From Swiss-Prot:
Source taxonomy: Archaea, Methanobacteriati, Methanobacteriota, Thermococci, Thermococcales
Residues reported to bind Mg(2+): 13, 42
Presence of keyword Cytoplasm: yes
Record's subcellular location: Cytoplasm
Annotated function: Plays an important role in the de novo pathway of purine nucleotide biosynthesis. Catalyzes the first committed step in the biosynthesis of AMP from IMP.
The protein, known as: Adenylosuccinate synthetase
TM region positions: none
Length: 339
C-alpha cells in the first residue's frame, strides 16, 4: 500500500482538513501522520453537523482504527496537545496518538516573543502561536525536545521508524501538511511566510519518509483562495466584492477575517510542479457555483462548475481527483478511479 501526502497549494485554509478527513474514513489508512510547522495552523472538519478544529493532532482523528502520529519536524505545544486530547476524547485519541521524541517544544516564552515582536506581529501578521521563535531556538540548538517534557512521556515514540515499518508491511500511510505553498519559507511570498518550508518534500521529511517512498501527492486548492495577515495577493478582490459573493471567512487560529481573491491559475501550476502533484483536490466548488452544492456525482454538476474544473486541469496540467461541494464529509466527488 502507498504513502499519500496532502498539502495546500495556496496560502493555507484550502480545505485540507476536509480532504484528509474523507481520505481517513474512505481509504482507512493504518497510520495518519501530521507534518508541517506546528500549532500555527488549524484544520477544521464538520462531522454530523458539528465542527471540530485541531492545531496539533492529525485531522484524520475520526478514523478510530488509525494510529495518529506527530512527526519529528513538527513543533509541539503541550498545552494545545492536552487540550485536544480532552476535546477529542469521544474518538479515543489519547489511546492512539504518538509524538516523536525529537519534536521541538513551544514554550510560553516563545508565544510571548511572537506576540510582542512588532515586526512579526505587526508587519508579518504572525498567528502568535510561538512557532517562529521556537523554530529559531531549534536552529540554534537550544530548544527543548518532547523527550524533555515529563508529561509527554506516555506518548513518545519514533515516528519515522513506525511509519517506515508500516510501509514495509504494506500499510497505507496518510500524511498531512499544514498551511500552504504560498507560505513556504523558501518558495512563498517572503518575508510574509511561515518559519519553514511547507512543500510535500518538507512534509515527507517531517515524518521521516524518504523521497522514493512517496506514492501520491495531493495538492489542495479552493475555488476562491484566501489569505490571513499581510503579504502579496495578486488576485485579491475588494472586501465589498467578497461580501457580495458571500465569501466571508475567519482564520481557525487567529479569528481574523481572511482576505479573498480569484483563482490564480499561474500560482496553482507552479505550486503543483514544485510539490510534485500527482493529483489535485478542489474545495468549495459550491462557492464558485451555488448550484453545485452537495452534488456527489460529477456528471450531475452544472456546466459552470464543470468548466471550472476542466480549466483547472488544462491550465495546471494535473488531473483533479477530489472535489468538495459542501462542508459535510459526504459532500465530495471522488474521481480517483478515473486517473
Amino acid at each position: 500500500m502507498p504513502s499519500v501526502i496532502v498539502v495546500g497549494g495556496q496560502w493555507g485554509d484550502e480545505g485540507k482538513g476536509s480532504i484528509i478527513a474523507y481520505l481517513a474514513l474512505h481509504d482507512e489508512p493504518e497510520i495518519i501522520a501530521r507534518g508541517g510547522v506546528g500549532t500555527n495552523a488549524g484544520h477544521s472538519v464538520v462531522i454530523n453537523g458539528k465542527k471540530y478544529a485541531v492545531r496539533q493532532l492529525p485531522t484524520g482523528f475520526m478514523q478510530t482504527k488509525a494510529r495518529l502520529l506527530v512527526g519529528a519536524g513538527v513543533l509541539v505545544d503541550p498545552e494545545v496537545f492536552f487540550y485536544e486530547l480532552e476535546h477529542l476524547k469521544d474518538f479515543n485519541v489519547a489511546e492512539r496518538v504518538g509524538i516523536d521524541y525529537r519534536c521541538a517544544i513551544i514554550e510560553p516564552k516563545h508565544k510571548e516573543m511572537d506576540r510582542k515582536n512588532d515586526y512579526l506581529h505587526g508587519t508579518i501578521g504572525t498567528t502568535g502561536s510561538g512557532c517562529g521563535p521556537a523554530n529559531a531556538d531549534r536552529v540554534m540548538r537550544v530548544a527543548k525536545q518532547a523527550k524533555d517534557i515529563k508529561e509527554l512521556e506516555p506518548y513518545l515514540t519514533d515516528v519515522a521508524a513506525e511509519v517506515n515499518d508500516a510501509l514495509d508491511e504494506g500499510a497505507l500511510v496518510l500524511v498531512e501538511g499544514t498551511q500552504g505553498f504560498g507560505l513556504s519559507l523558501y518558495y512563498g511570498t517572503y518575508p510574509y511566510v511561515t518559519s519553514k518550508d511547507t512543500t510535500a518534500s518538507a512534509v515527507a521529511s517531517d515524518v521521516g519518509i524518504g523521497p522514493t517512498r512517496v506514492d501520491d501527492v495531493i495538492v489542495v486548492f479552493k475555488s476562491f483562495p484566501t489569505r490571513v495577515g499581510a503579504g502579496p495577493f495578486p488576485t485579491e478582490m475588494p472586501m465589498e466584492e467578497a461580501d457580495r459573493l458571500g465569501l466571508i471567512e475567519y482564520g481557525t487560529v487567529t479569528g481574523r477575517r481572511r482576505r479573498v481573491g480569484w483563482f490564480d491559475f499561474e500560482m496553482a501550476r507552479y505550486a503543483a510542479r514544485i510539490n510534485g502533484a500527482t493529483m489535485l483536490a478542489v474545495t468549495m466548488l459550491d462557492k464558485y457555483d451555488k448550484e453545485a452544492f452537495g452534488i456527489t456525482d460529477y456528471d450531475k454538476l452544472p456546466r459552470k462548475a464543470k468548466e471550472f474544473i476542466e480549466e483547472i486541469e488544462e491550465r495546471v496540467g494535473v488531473p483533479v481527483g477530489l472535489i468538495k461541494t459542501g462542508p459535510e464529509l459526504e459532500h465530495i466527488i471522488d474521481l480517483r478511479e478515473n486517473i
